[in-house]
């Protein structure tokens, strides 16, 4: 398995902040169980935010002309992200549909990579959905794009209203799928079909 390149963070600053946070909540950062916690948490954040300085459209390195003019759908792309409001995870699945223009298609894994890059940063689900769609539009110039993201937010599960299992669904449509409701509904039905 290829090792993921981690975002370059100011490790010392991150570790010091985590150390201070542990003190702020009344913990002893020098006790045995917490000695390496600042280092571990800083490393985790470097992984969680590895997409922060990347552009999802740059993941579309493989573009082919296949004279395919019908919809391409990739469903159930799992992702994890971090809510920028509460700094707790949200996770779920992205479903992506695009209608090629002039036969321009991309490798299917590139769609999953774009989701990965866009999700690995402090994020809002609404923005995540739009960033995925916009990356595809910029890279392939398709006739239409539809992205549906469904996710469970730990800020609704662990705190506040405490409603585990609740899902948030967001969509972003571009091109034909924004302009033509019947086309959008047809593709949406395919995306959500079990």
Curated annotation (Swiss-Prot):
Q: Does the keyword Chloroplast apply?
A: no
> Do you know which SUPFAM superfamilies this protein is assigned to?
Tetrahydrobiopterin biosynthesis enzymes-like (SSF55620)
Query: What keywords is this UniProt entry annotated with?
Result: GTP-binding, Hydrolase, Metal-binding, Nucleotide-binding, One-carbon metabolism, Zinc
Picking any one GO biological process from the record gives: tetrahydrofolate biosynthetic process
Per UniProt, the enzyme's principal EC class comes to: hydrolase
**UniProt-listed Enzyme Commission number(s):** 3.5.4.16
Pathway stated in the Swiss-Prot or TrEMBL entry: Cofactor biosynthesis; 7,8-dihydroneopterin triphosphate biosynthesis; 7,8-dihydroneopterin triphosphate from GTP: step 1/1
The UniProt GO MF terms for this protein read: GTP binding; GTP cyclohydrolase I activity; zinc ion binding
- Do you know which Gene3D superfamilies this protein is assigned to? 1.10.286.10, 3.30.1130.10
**Catalysis: reaction(s):** GTP + H2O = 7,8-dihydroneopterin 3'-triphosphate + formate + H(+)
Recorded GO CC terms:
cytoplasm
Sites where the protein binds Zn(2+): 83, 86, 155
Q: What family is this protein classified in?
A: Belongs to the GTP cyclohydrolase I family.
Complex formation: Toroid-shaped homodecamer, composed of two pentamers of five dimers.
Name-wise, this protein is GTP cyclohydrolase 1
Species of provenance: Streptococcus pyogenes
User: Coding gene?
Assistant: folE
């Amino acid at each position: 398995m290829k090792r993921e390149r981690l975002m370059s963070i100011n490790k010392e600053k991150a570790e010091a902040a985590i150390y201070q946070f542990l003190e702020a909540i009344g913990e002893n950062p020098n006790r045995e169980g917490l000695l390496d916690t600042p280092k571990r948490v800083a490393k985790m954040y470097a992984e969680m935010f590895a997409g922060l300085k990347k552009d999802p459209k740059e993941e579309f390195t493989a573009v082919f002309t296949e004279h395919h003019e019908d919809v391409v759908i990739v469903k159930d792309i799992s992702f994890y992200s971090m809510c920028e409001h509460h700094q707790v995870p949200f996770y779920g699945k992205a479903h992506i549909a695009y209608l090629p223009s002039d036969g321009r298609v991309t490798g299917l894994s590139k769609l999953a990579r774009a989701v990965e890059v866009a999700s690995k940063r402090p994020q809002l689900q609404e923005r995540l959905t739009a960033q995925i769609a916009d990356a595809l539009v910029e890279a392939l110039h398709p006739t239409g794009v539809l992205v549906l993201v469904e996710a469970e937010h730990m800020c609704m599960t662990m705190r506040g209203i405490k409603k585990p299992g609740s899902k948030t669904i967001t969509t972003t449509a571009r091109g034909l799928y924004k302009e033509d409701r019947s086309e959008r509904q047809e593709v949406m039905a395919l995306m959500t079909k079990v």
